[in-house]
Amino acid sequence: MKSKTTKKTIPKEYLDIEKWQTDRRSFLRGALVAGAMTQIGFFTSCSVKLKEGNDLLTPEQATILDDIINIFFPDDGNGPSAEDINAFGYVMWLLHDTLNRKIEDNAYIIVGLNWADETAQEIYFAPFVELSQEQKENLVGEFTKMKWGSNWSSMMITLILEALVLDPIYGGNTNEVGWTWLNHTPGYPRPSETNRYERIMERQMKLKKDGEV
């Protein structure tokens, strides 16, 4: 049965995708200096389980996310794949980030997964997860030509690139595979567990709260 098609409205923050990418790069520069975003253990212990569904994504959404990012960055011998850099785990951390990201930012990631599924049913009359690999790749090629798909895909590729270039302590760039591929030597001092992103944000929020008392 063909699913009901919803209106695909791009959030205003993402209408100018180039500005969003510039703002995101500015945040990354600060994050690289400030410290790490998360603990490696979260990603290594949960990434497989998350693909079975979790508190934010259904099993279908998790599968769509994993499939799409691996189509964007495939294991084709031309550089690290999305799986190599644990892009799925990095995106899942972003979806759980309530300190820096707006609810609307994370909602846009998820709604894009739903739109991809709707587009699959519009073109192939079947859910995304039931498509063959060739059909999935063709579908991604088709929706990236659409306004919503071009915008959403640009955002997702930017996030995957973050997983490629950040310090491994952030959860992506597993075993420094991204740095090795880019022949990049990281700056020092490297981020540590004591000054990772959440801890810095928590301290800032506490100082702000104490100042309001």
Language-model features: locations:
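Mature-region segments of soluble proteins
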Residues: 2-3, 78-80, 86-213
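C-terminal segment of N-terminal export signals and the immediately downstream linker at the start
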Residues: 16-26, 41-79
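Short, amphipathic alpha-helical segments
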Residues: 22-32, 100, 110-112
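N-terminal secretory signal peptides
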Residues: 1-22
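N-terminal export signals
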Residues: 10-15, 26-46, 132
